[in-house]
Amino acid sequence: MDSTNPVFHGLREPHVNIIEKTDEEIRAAAEPLWRDLVKNSNEGKYGEFVKNFSGVMALAMNQVTAGHQFANSELARNLSEHFDYLGIIRRGEHVTVLYRQRSTKKDGEWLGRLVLGYEDGKIRIFGASIF
């Protein structure tokens, strides 16, 4: 061990890869994030919607795009608070958590996708969609 390595001096955290977490640990982290996305999408709260996004994702999801989505998508504003966990896919340094999502206004089911990984030592959202 090199004592000059900043990891051993607390200056930065050792590299963490989310795929090393168990399904239960990933699910425990993912479900509150998904619930917040559903709630904030329904309420059209852009600032709250993006608060757990990675830096790159937050930049890509600008306020104009999100505002248009919230204003013009009946689905995005009427997501059911009830969803079913379907599974986890691990790839590289990210996991994709899949959900069966329903609407309070439209019949049918949609596939919810939440991509998670670490950024600056915290679990962040790197992708989220419903299709």
Segment roles from a protein language model:
Residues M1-E43:
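Short, low-complexity N-terminal intrinsically disordered segments enriched in polar/charged residues
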Residues M1-F8, E43-V50, R77-S80, T104-W110:
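Short, charge-rich amphipathic segments
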Residues V7, V16, V38, V50, ...:
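Extended aliphatic helical segments
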Residues P32, D36, G47-R90:
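Short solvent-exposed beta->alpha transition segments
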Residues G67-Y118, G127-F131:
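Surface-exposed, charged secondary-structure patches
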